[in-house]
C-alpha cells in the first residue's frame, strides 16, 4: 500500500496533527497495521487535540446550515430505513422571480427528521470554514483527496442499511451515541466502480451474521474503516451527530 510508505517517511506524531485527532496511533503504526487493513477504534481520551469535535461542527452549526444558509441540494440528502428520499420532499423555490428550485426548506426537513429520517449534510469541506481548514490539513498529511459529510440521526433510528464504501473512512462522533456493527469485506479493496449495490444479497447475508466489531461511539470517539468493510450504524437513546471523512484511494485503475 503506497500510502503506508508515504506516512512512515513523511509524518511524525508532531507533524500529523490532523491525523492525530482521528486515530490514537503513531503514524508509522497506523500505516503498517491499520491503513487499508483493519478498523481502528480510538476513544476520546486517547486522541490528541481539542476535546471532542464540536469545534469542527456542532449541533448549533447544523441548525444554522439548515435554517439560515440557504442550503441547496446536493448539499443535503435525507435517508430513512435504507432509502434515500426524493429531494422534492424537502426542497422548493427561492421566492418570486427566483430561478432557484432546489433550496432546502427547513420546515420540511424537520418534519422528515421528526419521522425518523437521517439528515446527511454533504460536501462540508467546501462550505463550512472549520471543516474546510481541517480537511485541507488532513488531505495534505495523507496526500489524498477527501470529502466530509455529517450525519444527524434521531434517537433509535438508522438511516442506511449495511453497506460498504469504496473509500477509506474516518468517523468522528460529535454528539450523542451511535452503535456501529462492522463486518469483514465481501470484496477486498473495492474500486469506485465496484459499489456495494452490485453485491447487495451477499452484503445483506454477511451483515446478518456475527460482526467483527460491535461498538458504541460516544462524543469525542473516532473510528477508522478501510474501504470495503461492511458497516451499519444506529443512534441510541439520544440523537446522534457524526462526521464522516472519506479518503479516496489512488490506484492504477
Name these PLM-found stretches.
Residues 224:
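Conserved beta-strand-loop-short alpha-helix elements that form
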Residues 1-10:
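N-terminal amphipathic/basic-hydrophobic helices that include classical n-h-c signal peptides
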Residues 10-25, 29-33, 48-221, 229-253:
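Active-site region of the double-stranded beta-helix
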Amino acid at each position: 500500500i503506497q500510502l503506508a510508505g508515504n506516512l512512515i517517511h513523511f509524518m511524525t506524531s508532531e507533524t500529523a496533527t490532523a491525523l492525530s485527532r482521528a486515530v490514537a496511533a503513531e503514524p508509522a503504526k497506523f500505516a503498517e497495521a491499520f491503513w487499508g487493513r483493519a478498523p481502528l477504534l480510538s476513544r476520546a481520551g486517547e486522541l490528541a487535540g481539542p476535546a471532542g469535535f464540536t469545534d469542527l461542527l456542532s449541533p448549533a452549526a447544523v441548525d444554522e446550515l439548515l435554517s439560515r444558509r440557504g442550503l441547496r441540494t446536493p448539499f443535503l440528502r435525507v435517508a430513512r430505513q435504507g432509502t434515500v428520499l426524493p429531494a422534492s420532499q424537502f426542497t422548493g423555490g427561492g421566492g418570486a422571480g427566483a430561478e432557484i428550485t432546489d433550496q432546502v426548506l427547513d420546515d420540511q426537513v424537520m418534519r422528515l427528521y421528526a419521522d425518523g429520517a437521517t439528515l446527511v449534510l454533504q460536501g462540508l469541506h467546501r462550505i463550512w470554514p472549520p471543516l474546510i481548514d481541517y480537511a485541507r490539513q488532513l488531505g495534505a498529511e495523507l496526500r489524498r483527496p477527501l470529502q466530509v459529510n455529517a450525519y444527524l440521526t434521531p434517537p433509535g433510528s438508522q438511516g442506511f442499511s449495511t453497506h460498504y464504501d469504496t473509500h477509506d473512512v474516518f468517523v468522528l462522533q460529535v454528539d450523542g451515541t451511535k452503535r456501529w456493527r462492522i463486518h469483514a469485506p465481501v470484496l477486498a479493496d473495492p474500486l469506485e466502480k465496484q459499489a456495494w449495490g452490485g453485491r447487495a444479497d451477499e452484503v445483506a447475508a454477511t451483515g446478518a451474521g456475527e460482526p467483527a466489531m460491535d461498538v458504541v461511539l460516544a462524543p469525542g470517539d473516532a473510528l477508522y474503516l478501510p474501504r470495503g468493510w461492511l458497516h451499519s450504524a444506529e443512534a441510541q437513546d439520544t440523537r446522534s451527530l457524526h462526521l464522516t471523512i472519506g479518503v479516496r484511494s489512488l490506484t492504477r485503475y
